[in-house]
Amino acid sequence: MVRLIRSLLWALLMLAGLSAAEAAEPPVLLVAHPGVDTRQLTRDTTRAIFAMRQRTWPDGQAVRVFVLPNDHPVHARFAKEQLAVYPHQLQLAWDRMVFSGTGQAPNRVTTQVEMRERIASTPGALGYLEREYLDDRVQVITMD
């Protein structure tokens, strides 16, 4: 009985530790080219843009979407936390559009530094970064 209680306490401590570790991860923020007039997007609009179903900003300007590789931890966190989808679901949507000829996949970058550089230099660009990679060459877009 004592062993069972110890095992349960150990499991609870491990779960609490995992939750604390996840909470310590920096947030992944939606960022855009500084020339974009939109300052806020809904989750549905953001999801539609990243699924490549919506190709323009609300003001009509073309959106250029940038993403990290599917196996990048920041991409996985952004997809799950901000878009409420799994990375493989996004990939399936992109593949479907490419193979059917109705659209194209987003632009891939390999690092957050490259993401920041490409967003800063591409009019209409949209992507995501952890806070530590932000600078005055990109703007944060809030999501509600």
Residue ranges and their predicted role:
Residues A23-D144:
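Flexible loop/hinge segments at secondary-structure junctions
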